[in-house]
Amino acid sequence: MIIDTTEVQAINSFSRSESLKEVYDLLWLLVPIFTPVLGITIGVLVIVWLEREISAGIQQRIGPEYAGPLGILQALADGTKLLFKEDLLPSRGDIRLFSIGPSIAVISILLSYSVIPFGYRLVLADLGIGVFLWIAISSIAPIGLLMSGYGSNNKYSFSGGLRAAAQSISYEIPLTPCVLSISLLSNSSSTVDIVEAQSKYGFWGWNLWRQPIGFIVFLISSLAECERLPFDLPEAEEELVAGYQTEYSGIKFGLFYVASYLNLLVSSLFVTVLYLGGWNLPIPYIFIPEPFGINKTDGVFGTTIDILITLAKSYLFLFVPIITRWTLPRMRMDQLLNLGWKFLLPISLGNLLLITSFQLVSL
């Protein structure tokens, strides 16, 4: 059987085109997955660098300066060092719980990014229950911390895990009515709809002015959820050595710090989305001159502007928890629980009742 050379070339060309098509399909499948991961990683590195520089300025000392320009790669160098350190395991601990705990803490926080809109319809999952899905997912992280403390077979670690669980429960409850109040004002639980509801009146339409009490309660509760000073009781050095992190080393030890900064960035982004207008500018788009083109919500330029506005608001807000860490002393455990249960919870419930009454009257 004689095969024409032209037919062989056509078959080879078809095979190459099919192979290229499969490669392109694989790339288009991986790009949406790795792009958010890369962006989140860079965001965490920037937060670590900002905190080190600000703390150095407050303490009148020189911050990181050798790893990269202005020391911006210091966090990456520290992470690489932890990656190659020995992973020690407690001899009498529960190895499975000890190993799974850090992963649960990080993964549960990473899932929260799926409902955060960085721009107009630029969100991984635009769900009708977006904000409440975030609350449900964030409740999983303390389970990982409790597993880490219990699996370490160490009294300091276990005490730190119990404190983390108690603190999360105490401040998750007052945080939920604040989110519910925002949902009532916006007539939706979707994060995209909440931002759109704030865009009607520009700067004065932000929920920051319509819900000042809820904003303060949300701010305090989110700081406690992130276990930042003055709420870092689960890992208080003077009392618990390092809390649930005491027995950890290597990359597992680093995962706890990754989870902490991821949670801080999530909280800042949700403050931006719920109270600071999301990707909207402080003034309505109609007042911006047409040559700037910012009033165009579609296209690459409009999407880039939306992302930059969201990130700018979030990183400006990050100065609050960073400065708070180096300003206020640590609270006692009884003060922490009293603040959550006896002060913030009644205020948030009263605020929710007030908003519900206004909404019923306006019907």
From Swiss-Prot:
GO CC aspect terms: chloroplast thylakoid membrane
E.C. number(s) listed in UniProt: 7.1.1.-
Reaction(s) catalysed by this chain's protein: a plastoquinone + NADH + (n+1) H(+)(in) = a plastoquinol + NAD(+) + n H(+)(out); a plastoquinone + NADPH + (n+1) H(+)(in) = a plastoquinol + NADP(+) + n H(+)(out)
Subcellular localization(s) per the UniProt record: Plastid, Chloroplast thylakoid membrane
Broad EC category: translocase
Annotated signal peptide: none
Protein name: NAD(P)H-quinone oxidoreductase subunit 1, chloroplastic
Complexes and interactors: NDH is composed of at least 16 different subunits, 5 of which are encoded in the nucleus.
Any GO molecular function: oxidoreductase activity, acting on NAD(P)H, quinone or similar compound as acceptor
UniProt topology in membrane: Multi-pass membrane protein
Protein family according to the UniProt entry: Belongs to the complex I subunit 1 family.
